[in-house]
Amino acid sequence: MLKLAVFDFDSTLMDGETIDFFAQELGIGEEVAKITEEAMSGRLDFFESLQKRVGLLKGLEYSVVEKISQNLPYMPGAKETISELKNRGMTVVCFSGGFRSATGFAKNILGYDADFSNVLHQKNGKLTGLVGGDMMFNFSKGDMLQRLQNILGVNEDETLVCGDGANDLSMFAHAGTRVAFCAREILEKEANIVIKKKDLTQILEKI
């Protein structure tokens, strides 16, 4: 029986990449999106790509970050799926290589139990181009998942993970139910449930 569900945020619970929305404000959307794609496809180290992309955001007003973070388009079926999983007695958590400004706000809307992500450093109301947090490396999600499993007393067979990119691979290694959601090929290969349609409720039919 499944007891723990862990979802990625960008392009999984949310329809898009938070950092790409920030970059569009600075007119560098295409440049940042290209780096994001390289990282999600596994062609670029996640830590390096994160530093590079956040560095390009230096000078962006934090008020703009908050406004964008609070107006993101959530994935169809996200709220309903989380609600149903919780009704089935599962703990639902969000792991994101993105940012607390977005995952913290979405927690109250989508209803998951906790979020682990990164924090954009700001000074005098503007981004400094620096970032820190729980989810900065390729191994971060797998590392945090193992810690959560230990705390909750949950094993791999009782764990569901759902993501779309290469930085989700580490958590796929520690879960019995592995959902690749509109995912890159590198992640699909490791999944035992593959969903091609942007509708998270499809998970409910398969578990």
Residue ranges and their predicted role:
Residues 69-207:
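C-terminal cap/substrate-recognition subdomain and adjoining C-terminal extension
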Residues 1-120, 198:
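Alpha-helical substrate-recognition element adjacent to the catalytic core
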